[in-house]
Amino acid sequence: DDQKTLMEFMGYCLLPNHNYESFLFLYGRSGANGKSVILDVLRSFFGDENVSSLQLQQFCGHELHALSNKIINIGSEIDKLGIDNGQLSNLKALVSPKDRLQINPKNQDPYSLEPSEKPKLAFAGNDKPKGNMDNAVFRRMLLISFDKEITDDKKIRGLSDRFDDEKGGILNMALLGLERLIKQGSFTKSQKMRDELEAYKDEVSPLRAFVRDYLIVDENYKTPSAYVRGLYLSWCEN
């Protein structure tokens, strides 16, 4: 199913709209798990001249000018300390089907990217950003985890380069993915993807996990807030 999602995303990048309001995030703690190969394939498929390389933490200020006239932005690393300078607002605007993105280039006149001019977004990271992440971001995120480290004896040297000769086949798979996306009306999301996204939400908000797992709503019963707070603090310590 992860492969289906990837092919749907590649097909989505061929559309001049953002009707499916999604961005790709490839996550894996190890640096040897295949994330970079996927990014290399995306870059090679769309061509360097059509790809920008802003990291999510650069989604503010005059650096946004780099997104102009690009099909896709590929960020190879995300700051684990969080994003709090307007980057997430710009991310939401970029994946929105209707919002324009205001660009203020250095020493040039400001302008706006129309919805059809905005690139699709793909990121990868060994860490998950925690600060200021909210449900609006999670709702738009296609989270694919790479949880298996590839040992040296199993690595295929120059694997990314081999895909250069397979662009025709990749295009066919992307078009099939796009057809599936349009037919379904949404991206394929495996149960693993859904579970990992829920776990990510819990990491961002431990209180969310505590409320879900330990509290039961009962209109006929009242529990002192101090008692609940004590339970929560004890839960956090454990």
Q: How should these model regions be labeled?
A:
Residues D1-N238:
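Feature primarily recognizes SF3-like P-loop helicase cores of small DNA viruses
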